[in-house]
From Swiss-Prot:
Residues 1-18, 66-79, 246-258 have a biased composition (Polar residues). This is Clathrin light chain 3. It is found in: Cytoplasmic vesicle membrane; Membrane, Coated pit. It comes from the Eukaryota. The lineage of its organism: Eukaryota, Viridiplantae, Streptophyta, Embryophyta, Tracheophyta.
Length: 258
């Protein structure tokens, strides 16, 4: 390459020859003579004019482009031989921005922390439930034992009173009857600023809120008291020397006559 440039420079130096020209005023002027003379330009133009026009030989209707003037293939053209550079839209993944990726990361951490807190809360609830069940069953067992003990004491007291009642019923019938009748006393209402407390319990009747009417029972008992039947009359002690075969009514009649 360097040798070619040096040859061209040397040729140019030879072609440009300097000659001194004597001027009319007595001055000398240096003129440069080139080897490329004007007749070469004339000959080149004459040759250009003498060449036949090849384009005139082509038919007018031919629109096929010449091989040297063909345009390059379009970038967006889809040929069978040239595939597209980009993949199809269905295979392309949507690009996520930094904000969306950061939100997804923070959301995943938040969900993980929330799930951990929920598991801890559920565990605490289960432990509290187990503790409550244990306390409930222990209190229930204590209450059952106390109720059993109280019921045994009540049963014992009831049996003792029942035996005592049947032992004294033959001696005093009216006292036994009075004990069988419930004592009904109206509720005492406390007036003033004192706290209202029911000091006496009222035995309710068959209808809620209404006491049992015992007036008819009182009438029957009063009638029986004034005119008792034979088996309810008290037995009088038999006098000494009395006939044991004599009935009680006859003995009462004898005593009245006396």
């Amino acid at each position: 390459m360097s040798s070619t440039l040096s040859n061209e420079e040397s040729g140019l130096g030879d072609s440009n020859r300097s000659t001194e020209v004597d001027g009319g005023d007595g001055g000398n002027f240096t003129a440069y003579e080139s080897r490329f003379q004007s007749q070469r330009f004339d000959s080149s133009f004459s040759n250009f004019d003498s060449q036949p026009e090849k384009e005139s030989d082509l038919p007018c209707g031919d629109s096929s482009p010449r091989p040297e003037t063909q345009s390059p293939p379009s970038i967006n053209s889809f040929d069978d031989t040239n595939d597209s550079i980009l993949p199809p839209p269905s295979a392309m993944e949507k690009e996520e921005g930094f904000a969306l990726r950061e939100w997804r990361r923070l959301n995943a951490l938040r969900l993980e922390e929330k799930e951990k807190e929920e598991k801890e809360m559920v565990q605490q609830i289960l432990e509290a439930a187990e503790q409550y069940k244990a306390e409930f069953y222990s209190k229930r067992n204590v209450t059952i034992e106390n109720n059993k003990k109280l019921n045994r004491e009540k049963e014992k007291f009831f049996l003792e009173n029942q035996e005592k009642f049947y032992a004294e019923a033959d001696k005093n019938n009216w006292k036994a009857i009075a004990e069988l009748i419930p004592r009904e006393v109206p509720v005492i209402e406390n007036r003033g600023n004192k706290k209202k407390t029911a000091t006496i319990t009222v035995i309710q009747g068959p209808k809620p809120g209404k006491p049992t009417d015992l007036s008819r029972m009182r009438q029957v008992l009063t009638k029986l008291k004034h005119n008792p039947p034979t088996h309810m009359k008290p037995k009088l002690p038999s006098p000494s020397g009395a006939d044991p075969n004599v009935s009680v009514s006859e003995q009462v009649t004898v005593t009245e006559k006396l």
